[in-house]
Amino acid sequence: MTVRRLESKSEHISDDEERKEQLDYKKQMDVDTDRNIVLNGRLESQIAKLSVPPHEMRVVDDYSNSKNAERHSGEIQAYAKFAGSTWTYYVKKIRIILGREPANPSPKGKNEDLEVIDMNFGPSKVVSRKHAVVEYDLDDQTWNCSVYGRNGIKVDGKLFKNGETVKLTSGSILEVAGLQMMFVLPNAAEQKQTDESTIKEDAIKSEISAAVNDAAEYGDNKKPPYSYSVMIAQAILSSSECMMTLSNIYSWISTHYPYYRTTKSGWQNSIRHNLSLNKAFRKVPRKSGEQGKGMKWSIVPEFREEFIAKTRKTPRKRSPSSPVPLLAKKREGSPSLPIPILPKMKDTSIPAAEPASSTTSARDQTPSTPKDVGSPSTAETSAEEKQMETYKTPTHAALSDIISTHDYALDANSASQTKKAAFGSPIGSSTYPTSSPAPFWKYVAVPNPHDWPQVGSYDTISPYRNPVNSHLIYSQIQQSSPKKIDEQLHDLQGVDLVNGFEGISSWRESMVNKLRSSVSDSPTMNLANSNSKSSPVAVQRVSTLPQASANKQAKEMESKMSNSPTQKSKTEENNQAVRAILDASATMEKQYDLHRLPTPTSQTESASVPQIANPPNSQNLVKEKSPQQYIQVPQSNVKSSA
């Protein structure tokens, strides 16, 4: 009796299990059917929006939906279908040809070699006779489209030309000559939904598993680097249904993060508050027939990607008190875990300091002597670098030197002083003669009337203004006080480069006024007649005249100039006077270069001034210098053109 009771009881349990399985399967089928209806409705809405060209298309007329309804009744067995907005072509072969049939087909027998067109896109000649071939690949188990037409085919908006092959999937939209159609496989809605869900679930599982498995690296008393909301999302996404009760969330967190097993800091209250206050989480009712009480928690779809992205981020930096590496260890039987990306450290290493001799201060550089500041120094300095370091301003700066000459004077005695000055106190502005864009006319060596050489050495009137005496060749004698002139020119006549320069017009006027005052204050001298047949190198002897006769001649010349019909204004006279001075200075420099003789070197400062050979009969030259000596008096044997 007991055996029969046990058998009847077991049969009763087995019947109940079968009924339960049948009910579950029926419910699942109903859910899948409803889901397919929804997805098929979405596909139908997309197909209805496909474009149809205005010109005639045979495939649209031959396979319109109305004709298909007349041909077929009920379900249609086909491998796939090309669905347009008003037509549908069912694929019943594993290889079909898309093209255009000839307008006038020839009798049978002649076109036996030609392949039959399955989908006729004529009569438009935009489509080739054999435009494309769609066939099923048995090896890869995929549908492929090979293009043969000259105008190509667009698949999902991308143009594929002749000779190219594209893989077709369910939902791919093809466009031929402006006609759009969708390639749909059987149960495409279910397949598409399954593929998308599978891809998403795989991505979620991979991301969540990577984040969850990091918990194995956190032992006791090691707090995980995630916020409560992220840990809740990890727990929910780890389940197959993406739903979890509150108690299961507690157990999942305490299982994967041992820190929360021993701590009693009220983390469960924090979890509960996050679920109720965070809008990313919502309550979901249990399935019908599911055991248990209470509702489950899930993630709002809009925030799902956000939580997945947060799990990808590197955990926050640990404190120095617990320098535990965040590298995941590969365990046996578990998938390889991704290595967290460590934050990049900035290169804070200080470059090696260069020797002090490699850098050159700006005071040692001029536009004419550039240096590479950052170049590494060598033990021995080349001769060219030494010359650059001992550069000194020329003592005699003329207009020709500044414009066309680059041979600067080098003073060997001042080399050590220049090197010390580079690292000492600031140097005055006179050390920078060409360091600022100053007017170069300030550097012209205008001869001082008191320092002019003796009479007869050269002609002060420009050859252009006095063509009668243009045949004279000038020579300059040794200066009596070179030190005084050097200091005067080296200081640039009291001009400060920092504060700037005065205008050229005011400078001309001041120079002319100085010249006139010196002429009026100095004693007058007369020039003697010279022998016109003498050598051009020889200097003419001049005899002094009485004071009264000299004054008389000067007054006569002034009266002639005042009574001249070609009177000039004050500004023109000043300009002419300054121009004459500049011409005379340039001529002096030229003659100085021609008649300069080599002199023996000496240690004294006066040896730096070039020595000029004394002209013949130089002992009879008048030692007193006067501006009147530079006014050329017309000779008696020369008639004036006036």
Curated annotation (Swiss-Prot):
This protein's UniProt keywords: Activator, Cell cycle, Cell division, DNA-binding, Mitosis, Nucleus, Phosphoprotein, Septation, Transcription, Transcription regulation
InterPro entries, per the entry: FHA_dom, Fork_head_dom, SMAD_FHA_dom_sf, TF_fork_head_CS_1, TF_fork_head_CS_2, WH-like_DNA-bd_sf, WH_DNA-bd_sf
Compositional bias per record (Low complexity), positions renumbered to this chain: 348-362
Keyword Cell division: yes
Comp. bias regions, Polar residues: 363-381, 519-552, 599-642
Positions of the FHA domain: 96-160
Region entry Disordered, spans: 1-23, 310-392, 519-574, 586-642
PTM field: Phosphorylated. Occurs periodically during mitosis.
Residues of the DNA-binding region: 223-318
Subcellular compartments: Nucleus
PROSITE patterns noted in UniProt: FHA_DOMAIN, FORK_HEAD_1, FORK_HEAD_2, FORK_HEAD_3
Basic residues bias (residue ranges): 310-319
Main function: Required for promoter sequence element PCB-driven, M-phase-specific transcription. Acts as a transcriptional activator with a role in the regulation of mitosis. Binds, cooperatively with mcm1, the CLB cluster regulatory elements throughout the cell cycle. Regulates the periodic transcription of cdc15 and spo12. Required for the correct timing, positioning and contraction of the division septum.
PANTHER family attached to this UniProt entry: CHECKPOINT SUPPRESSOR 1-LIKE, ISOFORM A-RELATED, FORK HEAD PROTEIN HOMOLOG 2
Name of the protein described by the UniProt record: Fork head protein homolog 2
Organism, as annotated: Schizosaccharomyces pombe (strain 972 / ATCC 24843)
